[in-house]
A protein has these predicted regions:
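Proline-centered loop/turn at the N-terminus of a beta-strand
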Residues: 145-147, 171
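ATP-dependent carboxylate/acyl-activation modules
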Residues: 1-2, 6-119, 129-133, 137-140, ...
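Short glycine-centered, acidic/aromatic-flanked micro-motifs in structured strand/loop junctions
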Residues: 121-123
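Short glycine-rich, flexible loops that bind phosphorylated cofactors or substrates
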Residues: 126
Length: 188
């Protein structure tokens, strides 16, 4: 929006004021605009996530969410609400982002509102065993005290399930719905 726009006596057109919205995915091509951004709109956790390159939105619930892909993450949040729970966040990792499992888990563990965590992986192109390996390494390093419930389906899920059993002594629940119900129950 440009308002006002004036024409000077010598014929030049000058925008005296303007407002614009830049898409988050395009701002990386404009570092000067990114530096002048509005970090005051981000929560502390959101600012930390952004600095770490994570896709995170802080919410007011008590069930932590870690999933692969925006669609699955939003579905997980919807099912949490369906079962009477409240998601504490939106946080997705996947594909090459599995290397961010540790900063993602550190971020979730620093959220004092989270009473339980659901980790929901569904692989088509992304391999669930690779994503699960990253999460297992983060869990082994950070040793979280809160209950964690897994749902793992798709490409590499047999290997992922074996990794969870062998390394953490846990098995994912049979369905996404079962894992989410358990997480909602544990958070109550």
């Amino acid at each position: 929006e440009i308002n006002p726009l004036i024409v000077t006596r010598d014929g030049r057109v000058v925008a005296l004021d303007c407002k614009f919205v830049m898409d988050d995915s395009g701002i990386v091509r404009h570092p000067d605009v990114a530096r002048a951004g509005t970090p005051e709109k981000l929560t502390g956790l959101e600012a930390r996530a952004k600095a770490a390159g994570l896709k995170y939105i802080d919410l007011e619930g008590n069930v932590g969410v870690l999933a692969n892909g925006a669609g699955l993450t939003m579905t997980t949040m919807d099912v949490i609400r369906h079962h009477g729970g409240r998601p504490a966040n939106f946080l997705e990792i996947g594909g090459e982002s599995y290397t961010q499992a540790r900063p993602a888990l550190e971020l979730l563990l620093s959220n004092s509102r989270i009473n339980s965590l659901v980790i929901n992986f569904c692989g088509a192109f992304a391999r669930t065993d690779v994503m699960t390996q990253g999460v297992i390494e983060a869990i082994e390093a950070l040793k979280p005290k809160l209950p964690i419930f897994f749902s793992v389906h798709g490409t590499g899920d047999e290997e992922a399930i074996k990794l969870l059993k062998d390394r953490l002594g846990v098995a994912p629940l049979a369905t996404m719905d079962d894992a989410i119900k358990a997480a909602v129950g544990a958070a109550a």
